[in-house]
Amino acid sequence: MRTKPQRPRATRSYLGQPCGSPRRTEETGETWERVAFSLFTHTCTQPLAGTVDTHLPSLLLPVILHPLGAASAGRALEPKADPHTCPYGRKESRGEKVRRGRAKSNSGPNVPGPPAAPQSLKSGSPSTRR
């Protein structure tokens, strides 16, 4: 029984990543550049809804030109995180430092701290343990 040669699947994302396993791409001998180019020609012949089809060549250009292929181009196409909402931003780390500083300054030597709750659990009352 003869098997047909595998053609590239039509269900690929516009970043050139195959929907199946990456092993399938290696088996057929396709490179990321060829996948992106075949996808590029496929999408140019079938226009998409709205104005996305006018921007599609500029979106695919990093995929075709970049040596690492779609993985790095996908990261490059992601929108930059807003510095005010980014959890690793400078503003958030400053706020954590201020909070830590306040916690240390508020707790004096004579002020009982939060370890009161764990001590009551350590006393061993069977009603609180599960």
Swiss-Prot record:
Residues 120-130 have a biased composition (Polar residues). It is found in: Nucleus. GO terms for cellular component: nucleus. This is Splicing regulatory small protein. Residues 1-29, 74-130 are annotated as: Disordered. Residues 1-10 have a biased composition (Basic residues). It comes from Homo sapiens (Human). Keywords: mRNA processing, mRNA splicing, Nucleus. Disulfide bonds: none annotated. Interacts with SRSF3; increases SRSF3 binding to specific exons. The gene is SRSP. One of its GO terms (molecular function) is pre-mRNA binding. Interacts with the splicing factor SRSF3 and increases its binding to specific exons within pre-mRNA, thereby regulating exon-inclusion during alternative splicing. Does not directly bind pre-mRNA and could regulate a wider range of splicing factors through a similar mechanism. Residues 16-22 are annotated as: Mediates interaction with SRSF3. Residues 77-98 have a biased composition (Basic and acidic residues).
